Amino acid sequence: MAGQTLYDKLWNAHEVTKRDDGSSLIYIDRHLLHEVTSPQAFEGLELANRAPWRLSANIASPDHNVPTVTKERSEGVAGIKDKVSRLQVLTLDNNCAKFDIAEFTINDARQGILHVVGPEQGLVLPGMTVVCGDSHTATHGALGCLAHGIGTSEVEHVLATQCLIQKKSKNMQIRVTGELGVGVTSKDVVLAIIAKIGTAGGTGHAIEFAGQVFEDMSMEGRMTVCNMAIEAGARVGMVAVDDTTINYVKGRPYAPNESQWQQAEAYWRTFYSDDDAVFDSVVEIDGSQIAPQVSWGTSPEMVVDVTQSVPTLDQAIDEAQEEGWLRAYTYMGLEAGQKITDIQLDRIFIGSCTNSRIEDLRDAAAVIKGRKVADNIKEAIVVAGSGQVKLQAEAEGLDALFTDAGFEWREPGCSMCLAMNADKLEPQEHCASTSNRNFEGRQGNGGRTHLVSPAMAAAAALAGHFVDVRTF
């Protein structure tokens, strides 16, 4: 009998029962809740006169709609100018109080983007099943978890039953071998992966990221990669548990205490793919050949090296790709063959659940070296992923490095990743963004998003256009 993959082990450990239609009832260990996808779920519970099945499995925090400007944030919920956004955050507060669910409220020092808060607080642990009404829940797979986004109706199901009916995915392994070059980060790795396999490459699969590059990668880096598994078409992304995982978890506020640690660690270390495990698909990439990446178009697969140019139509593999590129040229205001380093920028965003952890902020700050944001940059903002990340960055003096250079130092939240709060692009503005999606209108109506690493975003802010951070 063949060995099991990491995904197989996680699935089997949480499978309550198999159903005749091929689906399974899966137990959920951790449920993360925010203000956008939870109101209808709580309303459904109330209408059915149900209570949450397991209160301790749920944790909430507002993140999508919260203001990041300090003055507005200091006013709490009242500081949210948009009426709908304010109502959503207030409704989350009321629902959590009503149903006795723990919440890190808007001005709690632990508040932040759920996909940053969960791991840093030790609320997400290796071997767990983790769900949230947000597609980037795959982030938590970096800890050796089975983690994925769910819809609002499923949010209600988890609250009521602590289970979900799911169909098992196929197994895909993406191996990145060798060593990354100087200036190449986890964000560049995942963008290079998506450029290679496309945004549909992982459809129907759970992706395990493996190989020397991931073995050497920090937990923050692994979270960045797993975060964007959804952009590669997969619902799930994960990395096997190893010493890096264990060392990251140890001492976290909600992690097991000393009396429980030995038993917990022994269990967690079982979550890896057996040597004889069989994958449905395997992709191999030479990490030493990856350069800093920049997205030029309106899909995360429209990515090239910073040293390259916007592709020309003769490089398209088929008519469908040709049509997509033509539309992207027009929307992005770019020309085929234009050098990436010739793209002038208007705004810079360093943040999001992809790149707002302490390592990301350190990487960006290291590029500044006493320089100033370029005159043509209208706004450059840095948004820590949580209150704890912000406090740590301030203790290290990173905030002063940013503000002295001309960046704005903001309060935690999803911010400019998506046009759901006050942080938005104006039409036709180009933004170097450390977020995960560059769809039309993602950061604001008519806004033009370029996905990059924190270091690349910082360098672009200083130059006013894209530059190769390796030689900047």
Swiss-Prot record:
Reaction catalyzed: (2R,3S)-3-isopropylmalate = (2S)-2-isopropylmalate
E.C. designation(s): 4.2.1.33
GO molecular function, one term: 3-isopropylmalate dehydratase activity
Disulfide-linked positions: none
GO biological process: L-leucine biosynthetic process
Assembly with partners or alone: Heterodimer of LeuC and LeuD.
Protein name: 3-isopropylmalate dehydratase large subunit
UniProt source species: Psychrobacter arcticus (strain DSM 17307 / VKM B-2377 / 273-4)
